[in-house]
A protein has these predicted regions:
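Conserved GNAT acetyl-CoA-binding A-motif
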Residues: 123-136
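Conserved GNAT-fold acetyl-CoA-binding loop/helix
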Residues: 29-54
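Conserved acetyl-CoA-binding loop-helix of GNAT-fold acetyltransferases
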Residues: 100-103, 109-122, 143-147
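A short beta-loop-alpha structural element at the N-terminal edge
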Residues: 12-26
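Conserved acetyl-CoA binding element of GNAT-fold acetyltransferases
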Residues: 88-105, 132-134
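Conserved beta-strand in the GNAT
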Residues: 66, 72-83, 87, 97, ...
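Conserved active-site alpha-helix within GNAT-family acetyltransferase domains
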Residues: 114-115, 137-154, 160
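Terminal substrate-recognition subdomain of acyl/acetyltransferases
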Residues: 1-5, 162-173
């Protein structure tokens, strides 16, 4: 549990349980709907169902965390531990890809995502590097990741005409 001194909110994370899949799916859909409406990209998490969340819980390629604020589920964080990412052919030992972090829309912009990311990182004791990508025109995402210690790699990937992904990383020493 981490207390945000500014707002005095109790924030915690833990490994996601299967019975949380539906609630997390609903939060994910609500959080990613505006991005789907803007970009209309087929990879948007808004398009994924409850089975997608449940399947990732049972895979050694992923680690899923549930975010709690004052005991209530407010979001999720998904890390990829093995395999391909948009910017890396194959994750190496100690590299982790922050595939998505999402928060209930009414709880966004309260540093919950940033704090949850920092809490999740403690769950990877062998981590050398964390990677994340996001649409480069989303300034609130950029600020969130920068405040969590990520830096811009300068790499970009044109996913479709109106969607360019920016790659950020956090190297641990």
């Amino acid at each position: 549990i981490l207390q945000n001194k500014k707002d005095w909110l109790a924030l915690s994370i833990r490994a996601t349980k299967e019975n949380e899949s539906l609630e997390l799916c609903n939060i994910q859909k609500a959080a990613f709907l505006p991005l789907y409406e803007k970009y209309r990209d087929e990879g948007n998490p808004y398009l994924r169902g409850v089975e997608d969340v449940a399947n990732r819980l049972n895979s050694d390629y992923f680690r899923y965390f549930t975010i709690f604020l004052d005991g209530e589920i407010v979001g999720g964080v998904l890390y990829k531990c093995k395999g391909r990412t948009p910017f890396i052919e194959n994750l190496e030992e100690g590299q982790y890809y922050l595939q998505r972090v999402y928060i209930k829309p009414e709880q966004q912009c309260k540093r919950i995502a940033q704090t949850a990311i920092l809490l999740c990182e403690k769950e990877f004791p062998n981590a050398k590097c964390f990677l994340v990508d996001f649409p480069e025109d989303l300034m609130k995402n950029k600020r969130c990741y920068e405040q969590a210690g990520f830096v811009d790699t300068g790499k970009r990937l044109q996913e479709q005409p109106n969607l360019v992904l920016a790659c950020f990383e956090k190297i641990l020493t």
